[in-house]
UniProtKB/Swiss-Prot annotation:
NCBIfam families per record: PRK05610.1, uS17_bact
Organism: Chlamydia muridarum (strain MoPn / Nigg)
MF-aspect GO terms: rRNA binding; structural constituent of ribosome
Its job: One of the primary rRNA binding proteins, it binds specifically to the 5'-end of 16S ribosomal RNA.
Gene3D superfamilies noted in UniProt: Nucleic acid-binding proteins (2.40.50.140)
Family under the similarity heading: Belongs to the universal ribosomal protein uS17 family.
Name of this protein: Small ribosomal subunit protein uS17
InterPro entries linked to this entry: NA-bd_OB-fold, Ribosomal_uS17, Ribosomal_uS17_bact/chlr, Ribosomal_uS17_CS
Subunit-structure text: Part of the 30S ribosomal subunit.
One Gene Ontology term, aspect cellular component: cytosolic small ribosomal subunit
The entry's keywords: Ribonucleoprotein, Ribosomal protein, RNA-binding, rRNA-binding
Length: 83
């Protein structure tokens, strides 16, 4: 069972909020879920630093994939643009 999961990399879809660094973008990934106790829909977001080889711009929707550590904070890379 564990062998099926091994080697699979996580992917997330988010919006580029900053592209001011060289070959690095900040991607905001939103998560919507129902609160277990209060049954209210909660919107939560996380920011990920991702390696940018595709030259995506601020405002683009992108798919990012987990990768080996590229720097102190970068552990994701941009795979493609999502329309």
């Amino acid at each position: 069972m564990a062998s099926d999961v091994r080697g699979r990399r996580k992917t997330k879809i988010g919006v580029v909020v900053s592209s001011k660094m060289e070959k690095t973008v900040v991607v905001r990934v939103e998560r919507v879920y129902s609160h277990p106790q209060y049954a209210k829909v909660v919107r939560d977001s996380s920011k990920y630093y991702a390696h940018n080889e595709l030259d995506v711009k601020e405002g683009d929707t992108v798919r990012i994939q987990e990768t080996r550590p590229l720097s102190k904070t970068k552990r994701w890379r941009v795979v493609d643009r999502v329309n």
